Amino acid sequence: WDPAYKKRTHDSLGLFLAQYLCNGFNLADAGRLTYNRTYFAEGGRAFEFMRKKTSARSNSMSVVIVPIIEPLKVILNEIGAKPEKDAYVFPQIFNGATDETLRRKLTVQENSNIKDRMNRICKEVLGWDKVVSGTWARHSFATNLKLAGVEELYISESMGHSQGNDVTSGYQDMYPLEIRFRNNSKLLNIKKEEEPIDIDSLTPEQMKEMLKKMMGQQ
């Protein structure tokens, strides 16, 4: 791979892992994610955003809280923008576009790029015959937390599933941030005393093991 393609693949890997670690959010939400008031109020330890449902049957929105566990922090340092009030976390997704039609096209294209590059990583780097995507990451978030014994209400709330008609009814401090950290750390079986994961230093075998954890195969 030439250096430019390696850089694009590195960024796609980061966005793919961010989708998994950010409660399985989709790229449309990732593109709109900002360093808002909650991020700074929590000392850079959490994101809060309004998740727009992608289903044609639903126009509802719900509040999602994402604890910034250590591996996610590494990803943000690698491919995220520097924290500034109300700045986009992943500005590369929309690349400054404000028109919603164009944003949708860019999201579709970026989803395709991530899928293609992740599948090349799986096949050419890991020697692994797996087909992965953003949808795969979202399903893995729910499945792996369930297998880890996390209650289904937490999983549903974390993914922005409606808890009623009130847009804020799913949150209201139902889960303190420390509980969110404890639960989301189970996504990669992280213990408090463990060192942060450095994605760039992972060997192919270590990367394969991490992806296996995402698939719930351990």
What is each model feature region?
Residues I69-D129:
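Active-site/catalytic core of tyrosine-dependent DNA strand-transfer enzymes
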Residues D2-K6, K52-P67, E100-E110, W128-W136:
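Short, contiguous acidic/charged loop-to-helix segments that flank catalytic cores in large enzymes
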Residues R32-E78:
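Conserved tyrosine-mediated DNA breakage-rejoining catalytic core shared by Y-recombinases
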Residues E70, K82-E84, F94-T101, D166, ...:
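C-terminal secondary-structure termini that scaffold catalytic or DNA-interacting sites
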Residues R51-S55, M159-I190:
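Catalytic-site neighborhood detector that most strongly recognizes the C-terminal catalytic loop/helix
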Residues W1-L27, G31:
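Basic, Lys/Arg- and aromatic-enriched nucleic-acid-binding interface segment
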Residues W1-T9, K85, K115-E157, H161:
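Short, basic (Lys/Arg/His-rich) helix/loop patches that form interaction surfaces
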Residues R37-A46, D129, V150-Q172:
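Short, polar N-cap/turn motifs at the start of nucleic acid-interacting alpha helices
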